[in-house]
Regions:
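Membrane-embedded alpha-helical bundles that form conduits across membranes
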Residues: 1-295
């Protein structure tokens, strides 16, 4: 009874708190699918939710409710075992949907109580071409529901214990920038990421552009009290060439993306795949603007 009463009081306090960038905390829905194929996706959600975040792992089973109850119970048991075995502070959920693509919106809207509704939805980057159109429809749905998007393109092994590490945030404008830096900072606070340098990177065509953008990046890091190194790359080479030259040996890259217009999904997917062919594990983000480190 005591624990429940404390939870209730704290939820009431959260309800009355005015939302701003200073008290923003990640509340994350992670769609994991087959758990043993998305281990690094789970790992990233754990890093992002460290200490102050709430992370729900979601497995969606498609089918009729009456036909899938046993499968749901087995899946939930497997997820609980995985969480306990790996000592993760994550919350499992298994949902039966007749159709995932049409049921996603209702699930996200109905998940959790008002003060701790999810503000981030995480997916793994699709591997099968047959899922591309559906994947982008999901991103569009999440955007319409005013949630931040985080997609992890997993290139597997990316950490060496005890070594110096680098996280590169490539800045291409203001829409996603603050959110990218916040994610990089949250990840860097985990013990696995000790000795990490966060680099705020931007490509400009000439020396005249360098000073303005360098000051902007330095100002954002200072205002947010995040230790980060701002680096401006002067180059007229393609963005892909610059990215490969400066970040191929980094441990993690964070990039902003936009949701393509209907009919442009395959072209967008192909362009991202080409851009990141030689890159390490990359987090692709689409921000709703609720994190503004300049405010």
């Amino acid at each position: 009874g005591f624990i429940y009463s404390r939870i209730s009081r704290n939820m009431q306090i959260l309800t009355k708190m005015k939302e701003n960038s200073k008290n923003w905390r990640p509340t994350i829905l992670v769609f994991v699918g087959v758990l043993n194929k998305r281990v690094n996706l789970v790992q990233f959600s754990k890093w992002l939710g460290k200490d102050a975040g709430i992370v729900s792992l979601v497995n969606v089973i498609t089918g009729e409710l009456k036909d899938c109850i046993t499968q749901r119970d087995e899946s939930l048991e497997q997820m609980n075992h995985f969480i306990e075995l790996n000592k993760l502070a994550l919350y499992p959920e298994v949902v039966i949907m007749k159709d995932f693509d049409s049921g996603l919106s209702s699930f996200i809207q109905g998940h959790s109580l008002a003060p701790i509704k999810p503000n981030i939805v995480m997916f793994g980057w699709p591997q099968k071409e047959t899922r591309i159109i559906h994947f982008y429809k999901h991103l569009q749905t999440v955007t319409e529901l005013n949630k931040n998007i985080v997609c992890v393109m997993d290139k597997s092994y990316f950490l060496k214990q005890g070594s110096k590490k680098v996280i590169d945030c490539w800045w291409r404008g203001c829409d996603n920038g603050s959110f990218m830096i916040m994610l990089a900072y949250l990840i860097s606070q985990n013990v696995e990421w000790e000795n990490t340098t966060i680099r705020l990177m931007r490509q400009v065509p000439n020396e005249e552009e360098k000073g303005k953008h360098l000051r902007e990046l330095q100002h954002i890091a200072t205002e947010a009290r995040i230790e980060a190194h701002a680096e401006i790359v002067i180059s007229n080479e393609s963005y892909q060439d610059v990215l490969n030259k400066h970040s191929r040996e980094s441990n993690l890259v964070v990039l902003g993306i936009e949701i393509p217009a209907p009919g442009q999904e395959l072209a967008h997917y192909t362009a991202i795949e080409k851009l990141l062919t030689q890159m390490p594990t990359t987090i692709l983000v689409k921000s709703i603007g609720d994190v503004d480190l300049k405010s």
